[in-house]
UniProtKB/Swiss-Prot annotation:
One of its GO terms (molecular function) is asparagine-tRNA ligase activity. GO terms for cellular component: cytoplasm. Gene3D superfamilies: Bira Bifunctional Protein, Domain 2, Nucleic acid-binding proteins. It comes from Cytophaga hutchinsonii (strain ATCC 33406 / DSM 1761 / CIP 103989 / NBRC 15051 / NCIMB 9469 / D465). This is Asparagine--tRNA ligase. It catalyses: tRNA(Asn) + L-asparagine + ATP = L-asparaginyl-tRNA(Asn) + AMP + diphosphate + H(+).
C-alpha cells in the first residue's frame, strides 16, 4: 500500500474514514497505559500531527519500547473518527515498523521546550522541531513565490556566477577563492601574492551580488532576475547579518526609478499575500509562539499603500522629532536601522520607500540626479526590519559612469565588460536587491536571522 502524507490525510479526512492507510514519520510524543498507546506522528508535510492508537496486546513489548520521541516509524491502520478531543480523526494501528530508533537517553530533542540558542547548536536536528519545520516550509513557499511572481510577469531567470573577479558593492568585504599554497604562495617581484599563478590567473572571490551580471542580461532580454547565494566577509555578529545569504535581484531595461519602486512594492505584497494564502497553519503557530502581532502585520503590508519619501524629507522628520537616537541625524549620513524603524513604526506606521539619497553614500553605478548631490537610489523600509530592499536606477551614460569610477577609485580595466554595455546600445534600466533572509525574518516574526536559514554562516561559525 502506498504511503499517504499527513497533510493530505488531514486536509481530506472525510474521504479517508474507514480506509486503510500507511503513514511514515517521526514520533513527537507517546503516552498511554498498559492497554493502549497514543502516538503523535509527524512527517514534515504539516505542522500538525496525527494520533496513532496502538492496542498494546497487538504488538510485542520490544517494538513498543522503541517507539520513543524522535524515532522513525511506519504505521498501517484504519482511519476512524476520533473519540478524544483535539483531533477529528485518528488511525487505529494494525502493523508497526520501527525504521530508526532514537535513544531517549541521548536524543537531544525531548518533549520539553528548547531555547533558540540551544537549537542553533544542533542545527542538524532543529528542522525536527515545530518552529523550524514551520520556518523551512515558509522558506520553501517564499522561494516558490519569488519564481512564480517573475514568471507571471515574463521575466527571465538568469544564473549569475558564484566565483567572480568583481566587487559589485565596492565594499571590499569579500571571501577570496584560491588554489595557491597558503603556506607558501607564489610572489611577484614586488613581494605581492602572484595571482597569475592561481587557478583563474587572477584574484577571485565569492560573489557579493549578482547585480552587475544581471544588468548585462537585462540589456538583451529586457527583464531578468537572479536568485542565489551571496557572501560578505563582514565581521558583524548581529541579529541581522550573515556571511552567506540569498539575494533576489531583478534588473529591468527601460525602467525609471518610479517603475522600480512600483515593482518592488508589488513584489513584496505578492510574497506576503502568498504566505497568508498558502501557509496559514505555520503562520498561526509562529503567531502564537513568537509574535502575537505577526499575522496582523502581514495583512497590513498587503492592504496598505507604501509611503514614498525623499531622503531629505526623511532627515527633516528625524531631526524634528523628540526621539533620542544613538546615532546623530544630519543630511549626508547613511541612515541607521533605528532611524529607518522610527520612520516605519512610529511616524508613518506603514512601509516606506526612501529615494534620492546622497551620492557620497551610495554605489558607483547609481544614476545621478540633476542636482549633482543625490542619486536615484531607493530603499524599502519595513516594520521590525528596517531596510528590506535596496535598489536604484542604474547609470546608463558611459562618460558619467567612467567619471564616477574615477571618483571612487575603481579601475576601468576591472569592469571593462560592464562599461561596454553602455558603449553598445545603452538603455535606461533599474533594479533592486531583496535579501531573502530579511524577508524571512519579516514573514516568520523570528527575531534573529540565524533562525531563518538552515545552516547559518557567521563569524567564527561554519559548522555543519
Amino acid at each position: 500500500m502506498k504511503r499517504i502524507k499527513i497533510k493530505e490525510l488531514l486536509s481530506n479526512s472525510s474521504q479517508y474514514i474507514d480506509q486503510q492507510v500507511v503513514l511514515k514519520g517521526w514520533v513527537r510524543t507517546k503516552r498511554g497505559n498498559k492497554h493502549v498507546a497514543f502516538v503523535a506522528l509527524n512527517d514534515g508535510s504539516t505542522i500538525h500531527t496525527i494520533q496513532i492508537v496502538l492496542d498494546v496486546a497487538k504488538f510485542n513489548e520490544e517494538q513498543l519500547k522503541d517507539v520513543t520521541t524522535g524515532a522513525c516509524i511506519s504505521i498501517s491502520g484504519k482511519v476512524v473518527t476520533s473519540q478524544g478531543a483535539g483531533q477529528s480523526i485518528e488511525v487505529q494501528g494494525d502493523t508497526l515498523e520501527v525504521i530508526g530508533v532514537a535513544d531517549p537517553e541521548t536524543y537531544p530533542l525531548q518533549k520539553k521546550g528548547h531555547s533558540l540558542e540551544f537549537l542553533r547548536e544542533i542545527a542538524h536536528l532543529r528542522p525536527r522541531t515545530n518552529t523550524f519545520s514551520c520556518v523551512l516550509r515558509l522558506r520553501h513557499a517564499m522561494a516558490f513565490a519569488v519564481h512564480s511572481f517573475f514568471n507571471e510577469k515574463g521575466f527571465v531567470y538568469v544564473h549569475t556566477p558564484i566565483i567572480t573577479g568583481s566587487d559589485a558593492e565596492g565594499a571590499g568585504a569579500m571571501f577570496q577563492v584560491t588554489t595557491l599554497d597558503l603556506k607558501n604562495p607564489s610572489k611577484t617581484k614586488e613581494g605581492e601574492v602572484d595571482f597569475t599563478k592561481d587557478f583563474f590567473g587572477k584574484a577571485t572571490n565569492l560573489t557579493v551580488s549578482g547585480q552587475l551580471e544581471g544588468e548585462l542580461a537585462a540589456m538583451a532580454l529586457g527583464e531578468v532576475y537572479t536568485f542565489g547565494p551571496t557572501f560578505r566577509a563582514e565581521n558583524s555578529n548581529t541579529t541581522r547579518h550573515l556571511a552567506e545569504f540569498w539575494m533576489i535581484e531583478p534588473e529591468m531595461a527601460f525602467y525609471e526609478i518610479q517603475d522600480n519602486m512600483d515593482l518592488a512594492e508589488e513584489f513584496l505584497k505578492y510574497l506576503v499575500k502568498y504566505a497568508l494564502d498558502n501557509c496559514i497553519d505555520d503562520l498561526n503557530f509562529l503567531n502564537e509562539m513568537y509574535d502575537k502581532e505577526l499575522i496582523e502585520r502581514l495583512k497590513s503590508v498587503v492592504e496598505t499603500p507604501f509611503v514614498r519619501l525623499n531622503y531629505t524629507e526623511a532627515v527633516d522628520i528625524l531631526i524634528a522629532t523628540k526621539q533620542k537616537f544613538e546615532y546623530k541625524v544630519e543630511w549626508g549620513i547613511d541612515l541607521q536601522s533605528e532611524h529607518e524603524r522610527y520612520l516605519v513604526e512610529k511616524h508613518f506606521k506603514k512601509p516606506v520607500i526612501l529615494t534620492n539619497y546622497p551620492k557620497a553614500i551610495k554605489a558607483f553605478y547609481m544614476k545621478a540626479n540633476e542636482d549633482g548631490k543625490t542619486v536615484r537610489a531607493m530603499d524599502v523600509l519595513f516594520p521590525g526590519i528596517g531596510e528590506i530592499i535596496g535598489g536604484s536606477q542604474r547609470e546608463d551614460n558611459l562618460e558619467k559612469l567612467q567619471e564616477r569610477c574615477k571618483e571612487v577609485g575603481i579601475h576601468e580595466n576591472d569592469i571593462w565588460w560592464y562599461l561596454e554595455t553602455r558603449k553598445f546600445g545603452s538603455a535606461p534600466h533599474s533594479g533592486f536587491g531583496l535579501g531573502f533572509e530579511r524577508l524571512m525574518l519579516f514573514v516568520t516574526g523570528m527575531g534573529n536571522i540565524r533562525d531563518v536559514i538552515p545552516f547559518p554562516r557567521t563569524p567564527q561559525s561554519a559548522e555543519f
